[in-house]
Amino acid sequence: MTVLVVGVGNIFLGDDGFGVEVAHRLSTKDLPDHVRVVDYGIRGMHLAYDLVGADHDLTIMVDATQRGDPPGTVYVIELDLPEPADTGGPAPLLDAHGMQPDVVMGLIAVLGGEPGRVLLVGCEPASLDHRMSLSPVVEAAVDTAVRVVTGLVGSYPFGTDEELTCALASLAK
């Protein structure tokens, strides 16, 4: 059983550096040997290619992702590959300097990959301005995300959606 935790984001765009900061903090933690933490930064295409032939049982992506929640909200979403009908057209718009998790998953599908189970630990950004620091509310959410990721790693494997829901509920306490 292997778990890959990936920090995604651009440290030059304020809160977009959230995933990178979480990965850096996780790299200082004493995690089980089967867990690998990698800062992918803006190398979304590299991440997609690494996940195409993934030998990981679980990948946890950590990224700032806009969902319309209050800034600093941390959430966990299970990501799925798009349906084949959704990838029959042209390849998704690619930006070699950064890709949202859904675009990474779309590229994996276009390439015919099977990434295994993929979770997104996301945080609602407050500001994506050109600066090299997180906003105070997102900075405060980094510790929450670290706790969520370590909790997910500690409770894995969870085979069913119900077990994942229970793991997430226990983290909320």
Residue ranges and their predicted role:
Residues 1-114, 120-123, 132-143, 152-173:
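N-terminal catalytic or cofactor-binding beta/alpha core of small enzyme domains
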Residues 128-129:
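Short, solvent-exposed loop/turn segments at secondary-structure junctions
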Residues 149:
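Hydrophobic "lid"/C-terminal helical patch
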